[in-house]
Amino acid sequence: MDFPSSLRPALFLTGPLGLSDVPDLSFMCSWRDALTLPEAQPQNSENGALHVTKDLLWEPATPGPLPMLPPLIDPWDPGLTARDLLFRGGCRYRKRPRVVLDVTEQISRFLLDHGDVAFAPLGKLMLENFKLEGAGSRTKKKTVVSVKKLLQDLGGHQPWGCPWAYLSNRQRRFSILGGPILGTSVASHLAELLHEELVLRWEQLLLDEACTGGALAWVPGRTPQFGQLVYPAGGAQDRLHFQEVVLTPGDNPQFLGKPGRIQLQGPVRQVVTCTVQGESKALIYTFLPHWLTCYLTPGPFHPSSALLAVRSDYHCAVWKFGKQWQPTLLQAMQVEKGATGISLSPHLPGELAICSRSGAVCLWSPEDGLRQIYRDPETLVFRDSSSWRWADFTAHPRVLTVGDRTGVKMLDTQGPPGCGLLLFRLGAEASCQKGERVLLTQYLGHSSPKCLPPTLHLVCTQFSLYLVDERLPLVPMLKWNHGLPSPLLLARLLPPPRPSCVQPLLLGGQGGQLQLLHLAGEGASVPRLAGPPQSLPSRIDSLPAFPLLEPKIQWRLQERLKAPTIGLAAVVPPLPSAPTPGLVLFQLSAAGDVFYQQLRPQVDSSLRRDAGPPGDTQPDCHAPTASWTSQDTAGCSQWLKALLKVPLAPPVWTAPTFTHRQMLGSTELRREEEEGQRLGVLRKAMARGQLLLQRDLGSLPAAEPPPAPESGLEDKLSERLGEAWAGRGAAWWERQQGRTSEPGRQTRRPKRRTQLSSSFSLSGHVDPSEDTSSPHSPEWPPADALPLPPTTPPSQELTPDACAQGVPSEQRQMLRDYMAKLPPQRDTPGCATTPPHSQASSVRATRSQQHTPVLSSSQPLRKKPRMGF
């Protein structure tokens, strides 16, 4: 490392930073009271190695970035938007417009959609007052509510104002029991937690600090044409992909094969690479003093290898690329409070600086382990609620920079704890705006010594960009208002297109905006902008390259292209035929899509030759317009087809519906417990590999009898078999014989027959019309309901003995005499045939006359009963 020959005024202190007798100038009200900077000396034509006379302009090969890799199969959810969190109605009596979070709507949605989460703790507290199964408790009727009946009441409850609205006793007891808790404790505590979560979500929408620094890196390969892109993938971004890419001169970059994958335990937030060359190690030996050479012991690194550092939320790891350019894990560590930044040392291979949310900064190397060098939970300049910390290296191997939202401080790792010097702070020294905060700090030591000094540091805020020299603290060498609509979280210092040329600086916003600056300032001159800044196309500018789509698919594509940018990488491909090489930019979106864009240098003499003052903000110079080719549109169409095959994100979680019909009873719960025990025994037997016996499963469930076959209405055989199958064959046979199994009816039947026979003695003939129209007796079934006697085969003759079966012995003689007077019936076989209605009536009347008993004179005369037909 060679410092410039002529140095600008600087602070030379003896001993460690912050521990010398010289008064500390970092807390002065203004640096103008102590120091003045000389004006930049005009450069002569001979010494003007910087080609600022012809400003460089990068021309994009396409109007927008193109997709390089096919979309991942994992669905992507864009998450919350500002419209979901803000209050839509206008707030009255407010002088200044302010952002108002709609807590009322959010808490109502939370109670409806996530009722199990909101009321689960209350359910456990009030479990003794609810009966979830079976019948209600008889001993605690006043303090125990049946959930099943309560759900029934709530299901039929009508809102107030309805004439059928009512409140049951259970609902009244439930409101008395849960009113004090549900009305005050849940609403107040849940509103506080929800408001805190909404504030965090709103801050995350404004600034997502998790991916500060970028999660996309380029690892050079064995030859200049080959390399690897390292980026996270997956729905949770917990898979680290290593995609090999070939850079062909005059053609688009192509990926080779499928990427290598490493599964991690958390989402990847930052990826940093650093190449280790043999020349750089020899240069370190020549620069370092004698007391630092002990740190440069020969390590396991190959002279031409690369290192890869990955930061997750609570883990950090380092990989090494050896001769075969395959990643080999060196070491991994866990950060309890959460990691916010990781940086690789450009001086000592394998050394890293790690920051945590607790305010601690540690040096970590696979050989020496972890060593804490700084810890301060408070911010540097003024109080700020953010716990974000950032660390980087400087031109000196043992001096680091630590940054937070209020400023940047330099630390001496060899000095006592707490010593240091402020490098940059937000305030009047830098003419900062109100509410301005530091978003990113980066060491620009990888710049070319002929373009920029190796002691520059980049400080980015949400409004401006600052260049600070570590040799002159608190003095911004350059301030420029970038004007990006989204937070500036990505910055890459690119190699110059040709020797002794201006050096491009690429800036990337969280919303996908890209800007390209050209920095110049070698020797003792102040760094300045060599030409106006240039705005590069973003991913949303590639929308015209896709075919016309339906509105729904078009909206999905736009949402995918508008995903936040979480990674940025730049590569200079080898172009032997061209005098100035081009530039390939890679972008990584939060959806996991990788886009690329080629830039070609173009000299434009119409631009201004001398840059204005550092503080002036010039209008952006847009790149020359290009046109889409058929190959570009075909590639976009193919990528779109693959995107449409990706399933959509799962729908928003909806509240489950509960019904009392699906609640289990005590027997069903017992059956479920027995089945669960059997499954547990089966799993244990399978795990041990032993034989499962019947006694291990308990008693077998009682086998239910098979269902009886369905019997027809007119098939007597089927009816008889069905009754016999059910075990009621004897009863069926008795019914067919005209008998009954009830003893009470058997005792009352002769008496009833006597009364009916006396009634029949009043008239010898019964009118059929009166018989059918009169109501039936309640104790005598209708004629069609009486069981029919079994049919007589046609071979049997109609004899008095055959028809007298089932008739008492004292009445058989009368029946024989009556049957003897009847004419023979040849058409109807047997007495099973039903006679005509008039004939049946005359038969019943004759039988009643024959059965009439003689009343004795001693018995009183009874009232004549009416006919029961």
Curated annotation (Swiss-Prot):
Keywords, sorted A to Z: DNA-binding, Nucleus, Phosphoprotein, Transcription, Transcription regulation
Listed Pfam families: TAF1C_beta-prop (PF20641), TAF1C_C (PF20643), TAF1C_HB (PF20642)
Q: Which InterPro entries match?
A: TAF1C, TAF1C_beta-prop, TAF1C_C, TAF1C_HB, WD40/YVTN_repeat-like_dom_sf, WD40_repeat_dom_sf
Q: Name a single GO biological process.
A: transcription initiation at RNA polymerase I promoter
Assigned GO CC terms: fibrillar center; nucleolus; nucleoplasm; RNA polymerase transcription factor SL1 complex
Q: Which domain of life is it from?
A: Eukaryota
Q: Which residue ranges have biased composition labelled Polar residues?
A: 835-860
Q: Which GO terms describe its molecular function?
A: RNA polymerase I core promoter sequence-specific DNA binding; RNA polymerase I general transcription initiation factor activity
Modification type Phosphothreonine: residues: T834
Q: Which residues carry this modification: Phosphoserine?
A: S848
Subcellular location field: Nucleus, Nucleolus
The record's section on SUPFAM superfamilies has: WD40 repeat-like
Which residues lie within the region annotated Disordered? 605-629, 729-869
**Quaternary structure per UniProt?**
Component of the transcription factor SL1/TIF-IB complex, composed of TBP and at least TAF1A, TAF1B, TAF1C and TAF1D. In the complex interacts directly with TBP, TAF1A and TAF1B. Interaction of the SL1/TIF-IB subunits with TBP excludes interaction of TBP with the transcription factor IID (TFIID) subunits. Interacts with MYC and RRN3. Interacts with p53/TP53; the interaction prevents the association of SL1/TIF-IB with UBTF and represses RNA polymerase I transcription.
Cited function: Component of the transcription factor SL1/TIF-IB complex, which is involved in the assembly of the PIC (pre-initiation complex) during RNA polymerase I-dependent transcription. The rate of PIC formation probably is primarily dependent on the rate of association of SL1/TIF-IB with the rDNA promoter. SL1/TIF-IB is involved in stabilization of nucleolar transcription factor 1/UBTF on rDNA. Formation of SL1/TIF-IB excludes the association of TBP with TFIID subunits. Recruits RNA polymerase I to the rRNA gene promoter via interaction with RRN3.
Q: What name has this protein been given in UniProt?
A: TATA box-binding protein-associated factor RNA polymerase I subunit C
Taxonomy, top ranks, is: Eukaryota, Metazoa, Chordata, Craniata, Vertebrata
